Amino acid sequence: MYDVAVIGGGPGGCRAAGLAARRGLKTVLFEREELGGVCLNYGCIPIKLLLHAARMYEALELEAPQFGIDAEGFRWDFETLWKRKERTVARLRAALRQRLQAAAVELVNSEAAVESKLPGGFCIEAGGCRYEARQPIWAAGGKPHIPAIPGIAEALAAGFAVTPRELPAAVPPSLLILGGGAAGIELATFFRIAGSAVTIVEAGNTLGGRLDFRLAQFLTAALEKRGVKIHTANTIPRIGDGWAELADGSRLTASKLLITCGWEAAAAVPASPGVQVIGDAAGRRFLAPVAEWEAEAAVDRLCGISPERTQPVVARAIFAIPEVATAGMTLDEARQMDAAAYERRLPLTLSGRYMAEHPLENGFGVGVYSGAGELLGVHLAGSGAAELAGSFQINGRAVMPPHPSLSEFNRLLQAGES
């Protein structure tokens, strides 16, 4: 019998399996597709690589002359870029597999289900075989939310509509993006710089979800300056072959429709009591750092360690160009608990390095404080915002940096992990 069976090999599942095995627990990890989950294979990492390419292209186009660089004649080579993306993902996947195997985690490439409760454990079925484990950890991850819009199923089947998982390997002449959250904004940024005519349709009043309104304005201005068309407070009630209808009856045509309407749990949680559920599968906060924190808490409980664990303050970022990042409360949220709460706004140009490296930007940071002066929230806009966000203490707690960021390395080094 295994001590721990982890179902799902995304950030939370891999974190739980590796930590359990390093603590001496006999551990098996089930993953039906590729290790790393959506984040590594289709989401966070490959999208950041595409954005890095877009950032370099735009820097050559707009900033190079200001630094005395004559950069005429550069062009996109999308075949090379896509190969680079696939190689990078494969390399990271292989490194993840090696780390898990080095920790003595048994890997099973199969879908798995918790079948029944046994005396002292659980029965798990995977690939026609049965496994017994003292404690399962359900980390089956999430999947893109597909809204119930007439015509969307047919559009997906025909290849007109895609999710970030099926990004076209060629840049489409025109792209309609349904959803103005992080993925929608990031991919709108890349495809517009790559040459697509891009339109975003967002049901909310602003882009970016629950962002400070100034960050939403910052993102909107950057996109519109590049020529991205944005329809907020709008919906698409019907989709056809090469078109989508807005709520007012007007039609938008496009070569591709990209669906970025949020996230949901990929599978139903097992009914058996006693199964620990972590990460996106729990349907609480769809963030990789949250999944990893919940994985650590789950393994602590298995090992009989019950430290005082409060929900972490997790920074989240939208890696547009320039990027924005946020952690903690907005001023409105702070004033619900402290009427004397206040805020301060400072320009990022107070940093000499920022001013030297980003002459075309006008970034800023906003701090939200309690009446007693304690920092309750930070909201940052400009290059480097994601790395800055993980450097604060909010309400007496260290902020977990956004994913993916270099700041995450601090935690690994402090924990002595390989």
What are these regions (language model features)?
Residues 47-84, 308-309:
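Glycine-rich active-site loop/strand segments that organize a redox cofactor
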Residues 87-93, 169-176, 182-238, 287-288, ...:
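Rossmann-like dinucleotide-binding cores of NAD(P)H-dependent redox enzymes
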Residues 12-16, 184-187, 266:
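Short glycine/serine/threonine-rich phosphate/pyrophosphate-binding segments
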Residues 29, 200, 278:
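Generic enzyme active-site microenvironment
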Residues 259-302:
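Contiguous mid-protein beta-loop-alpha structural module that forms a pocket-lining wall or clamp
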Residues 1-7, 19-26, 35-45, 52, ...:
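FAD-binding core/adjacent interface of flavoenzyme oxidoreductases
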Residues 33-55, 206-219:
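Conserved N-terminal glycine-rich FAD pyrophosphate-binding loop of Rossmann-like flavoproteins
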Residues 7-12, 16-18, 22-33, 45, ...:
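Flexible, glycine-rich terminal cap/loop adjacent to redox cofactors
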